[in-house]
Amino acid sequence: DPDCQVVVTTGCTEAIAAALLGLVDPGDEVVVLEPYYDSYTAMIQMAGGVRRPVTLRAPGIGDEHSRLDVDELRAAVTPRTRFVLLNSPHNPTGTVLTPGELQAVADVALEHDLVVITDEVYEHLVFDGSEHVPIATLPGMFERTLTLSSVGKSYSFTGWKVGWATGPADLVGAVLAAKQWLTFTSGSPL
């Protein structure tokens, strides 16, 4: 429903800021895969959240990309953890999480009642036979996933700051509540 499940933002960075400011309460933990886009740390801190990093592991023999260690992901979750901030395809490594890795993230989110905030700005920039699968499409995940993206990377309009957040109405509503006080409204090309 475009009236309550979509909000347009001034680029994906604003979507990230509004999502974290709108959803994270002081002391909430946010699991984030590192290395990561530099605004993640600043926005988690601005929201009063606590960053719980999980380091992607360097490529092994026969693998071109870094990999998620599922045991480390599970170990990062504590009773204060409320969110997983996901980025796949990943900036800066280029890693595209495998279906098995995505399912592991989904399993952890479902098991611990976590919300997944997924930054998918590189969803159309996938190479070497990899396939981007939105985590929101996995069973049980739409209800707990906020998907963020923009036209900047996918359509080579990096200066045209048009982004969005999509997901269930309660999550999008929280983004909208914070976004209203960041830029009030986003520009339009017309």
What are these language model-derived features?
Residues R52, L56-D128:
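Active-site phosphate-binding strand-loop segment of PLP-dependent enzymes
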